[in-house]
Amino acid sequence: MMKTSAIHSPFEAPNTISLVAGTGDANNPLNAFDMSLLESGIGNLNLIRISSIMPPKAAIIPLPKIPQGSLVPTAYGYQISEVKGETVAAGISVAVPKDKELCGLIMEYECIGGKKECEDTVRNMAKEGFEMRGWEIDEIISIASEHTVENIGCAFAAAALWYK
């Protein structure tokens, strides 16, 4: 049997997670994306895109006040469209294990379509991820955004990890 050793890293794992979502519409894709970040409350942070693992025992909290310019580990999904009248959506879910020694799963999804379809899909993805691991779910939380494009539109959803 393989012995597990402690993780040695210069970085401490974040101990909080916050779900946020926003939308934007602008004259170009980057500004639409930026507007969606601003609406979600994380537009003045440097997002470091991470894979979909929530550190064990991380607390799910409302977005704290994070200093501008901070490097923030973030899992996110976004959908941009330039088709006027098209509806775009993005969602994120977090599955929390019953066994608090295990990590949680963060799933992100984006689509051409509505918020309900997106949120249902991202919640099912979290369930499937736990089934693949043989773990029991304590709870799943999720958030999604939806936007009907006027010029160039973006829907965005994220899980921002931070520290207490």
Swiss-Prot record:
Catalytic activity annotation: L-arginine + H(+) = agmatine + CO2
First-level EC class: lyase
A Pfam family that the UniProt record links to this protein: PvlArgDC
Site features described as Cleavage (non-hydrolytic), chain residue numbers: S51, S52
GO biological process, one term: arginine catabolic process
Alphabetized GO MF terms: arginine decarboxylase activity
EC number(s) per entry: 4.1.1.19
InterPro entries in the cross-refs: Pyr-dep_his/arg-deCO2ase, Pyr-dep_his/arg-deCO2ase_sand, Pyruvoyl-dep_arg_deCO2ase
Cofactor stoichiometry and binding remark: Binds 1 pyruvoyl group covalently per subunit.
Cofactor: pyruvate
Keywords, in A-Z order: Decarboxylase, Lyase, Pyruvate
HAMAP family with a match to the protein in the record: PvlArgDC (MF_01404)
Family stated for the protein in its record: Belongs to the PdaD family.
Protein name per the record: Pyruvoyl-dependent arginine decarboxylase
